[in-house]
Amino acid sequence: MIDILDVKSRATIQDLGRFGLRRFGISHCGAMDKLALRAGNILLGNAENVPAIEVPLGGITLQFQQDMNFCVTGAFYEMMLDDKPVFAYWRYQVRAGQILKMARAKIGMYGYLCVQGGFVLPQALNSCSTDLRAQIGGIEGRCLQAGDQLQTANDHILRSEIGIAPIPLRDVIRALPSSEYQAFKRKSQYYWWRNEWTLQSNSDRMGYRFQGQTLELKQPLEMLSHAIQFGSVQVPPSGQPIILMADAQTTGGYPKIANVIDADLGALAQVRLGSTIKFEAVSLQEAAKLRRKNEIYLDQIRRIVDEKN
């Protein structure tokens, strides 16, 4: 079991999300950086979909009530286990009574505290992920708060402490032109790929809002609501793009200029508020190769874990 002693961020329980329910209007949800969550679970010998604590930017203190292994992946935090500094992408042994403090993220946005065996929580629509709008999943569909107790499915077999290569963060996010790309003026197409974009403070798990050069359509475009997904880049009348994130709604009516490729969704999630990024066009073939590269990275972790366990 783990006791939450203090929380200063909107930390939630997340797994890989809800699959096959978007046609019913159910958001996918799940970890913002799914690659980081998968890496953490594999490092601990867990199934990839085991729920973890997603911590945005930092500000959580917790106490372990039993011996176990844990790791933190995703963002790079200032962390202390009692009075000893600990680091991201390392599997640590912890003893009952020890206290972990994740003070703040130095690099990146979302960290994933994974524990050996994962957390034991009731599922809502086949997932433990917290959906804050629907108020389902996790702990009563809400953010974690001081006093919460999280039951763990610990197998009581402590594994050696090992580290893995971290997932590199990016300030150039790769994307594909979307279905309405040709509806935008040529100069707006140029601006999208060539200019820098700043992530605004009103961004959240539903959507990342960027500020930059105004994107303009060739002519007014009336659209029926249509399916959208994590990574879709919508352009509302303001001309400032919104990239739909893990908690995004299932349909939308704004034209889309691009779609962030699957391989870079985690890197996009780790962009800090106020940071500036650029977008790079890739082909479908390149997108598939980059996705496979992520799977190779996870396969490498599996081999390391098999050798060290």
UniProtKB/Swiss-Prot annotation:
InterPro entries: CT_A_B, Cyclophilin-like_dom_sf, PxpC
Enzyme class: hydrolase
Annotated SUPFAM superfamilies: Cyclophilin-like
EC number: 3.5.2.9
The entry's keywords: ATP-binding, Hydrolase, Nucleotide-binding
Superkingdom as given in the UniProt entry: Bacteria
Substrates-to-products reaction catalysed: 5-oxo-L-proline + ATP + 2 H2O = L-glutamate + ADP + phosphate + H(+)
GO molecular function: 5-oxoprolinase (ATP-hydrolyzing) activity; ATP binding
SMART domains: AHS2
Subunit relationships: Forms a complex composed of PxpA, PxpB and PxpC.
Function statement: Catalyzes the cleavage of 5-oxoproline to form L-glutamate coupled to the hydrolysis of ATP to ADP and inorganic phosphate.
Family membership: Belongs to the PxpC family.
Name of the protein described by the UniProt record: 5-oxoprolinase subunit C
Organism: Haemophilus influenzae (strain ATCC 51907 / DSM 11121 / KW20 / Rd)
Gene: pxpC
